[in-house]
Regions:
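Small/aliphatic-rich secondary-structure junction motif
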Residues: 2-63
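Gly/Ser-rich helix-loop-strand patches that form or flank binding pockets
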Residues: 108-157
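Short, well-ordered coil/turn elements that cap or connect secondary structure elements
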Residues: 29, 89-91, 144
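General small-molecule cofactor/ligand-binding pocket signal
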Residues: 37, 95-99, 150
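Structural beta-alpha unit
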Residues: 1, 42-44, 75, 79, ...
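Active-site phosphate/pyrophosphate- and oxyanion-stabilizing loops and adjacent acidic/basic residues
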Residues: 24, 82, 86, 139
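A short acidic, glycine-rich active-site loop
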Residues: 57-76
Length: 157
């Protein structure tokens, strides 16, 4: 097996941080190109207007700016990517991606675009009912990825 390109998925949790460290070490061992992806999921804002109780018509907006919210998310994404590279890959050339949309689908799309040979992802910390209702990002990636997926647990750390 030859691994020429490793794609590392990074979110804001400890599981993903540990997986990133593991992924960069794997890339070093194989002398592989490395990609780092962070997915920005769109935030759906609830209706932010107040309604006049007598006439039932909207009276004013609460002023939440979706563009500003997207800028904040973009900034957070850039920060986590930069911090991860500084911490684990300062000596490496890393191609980084910020994708928008569903986390699992974004990782898979990025893997295809990067021509990754393997995806490295952390286990997700969801458990119980939350996992049942929401699903698992790593599970979705494993089931739908066109390339092998290495799921790195936090246990044993």
């Amino acid at each position: 097996m030859v691994i020429k390109k490793v794609l590392i998925a990074r979110d804001y949790g400890k599981h993903a941080e540990h997986a990133a460290e593991y992924g960069f070490e794997l890339a070093r061992k194989f002398g592989a190109e490395t990609g780092l992806v962070n997915i920005v999921e769109p935030v759906i804002l609830p209706s932010v207007t107040t309604t006049d109780p007598i006439i039932g018509m909207p009276t004013e907006s609460l002023g939440v700016d979706e563009r500003e919210l997207m800028d904040i998310q973009q900034s957070q994404s850039e920060n986590i990517v930069d911090q991860t590279i500084r911490k684990f890959a300062a000596d490496m050339q890393v191609t980084h991606f910020t994708e928008y949309g569903s986390t699992a689908d974004g990782i898979i799309t990025c893997a295809k675009e990067f021509n990754a040979d393997i995806i490295v992802i952390g286990t997700h910390s969801r458990t119980g009912l939350d996992r049942l209702l929401m699903g698992s990002v790593s599970e979705h990636v494993v089931r739908h990825s066109p390339v092998p997926v290495l799921v790195v647990p936090l246990k044993g750390r």
